[in-house]
């Protein structure tokens, strides 16, 4: 499901969600248009929870919004992905900017907690404060998607 980063949940989002529910289609949402004026990806996530009544968490955080949008932080790998080139088609991977590390840790913890509800191994690792492998996170995400 694609959501507008400015308008959030729109009438067609509700229609698409209704059809996805009807046919038991797992849902993964993308927040688009983060380079537009008034963009706020958190409104999209809040709308998914409040309007569509689904559990939603961020798996990426934008680096800048509107004309300052430069890339995203991957909360699974905990790396910053910058989109360079004339059309943003060249990906440059770097460490997370210092001014975004705290937010990245916060949203990663929310994501890990949410998807761990569907994977006992991951839940155990979280409770024991163990390092969580990327493969374990991917498995938990897959399980969370098919249990909607």
Language model regions located:
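P-loop NTPase catalytic nucleotide-binding module
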Residues: 4-146
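Redox-cofactor binding/interface segments in oxidoreductases and associated redox assembly factors
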Residues: 1
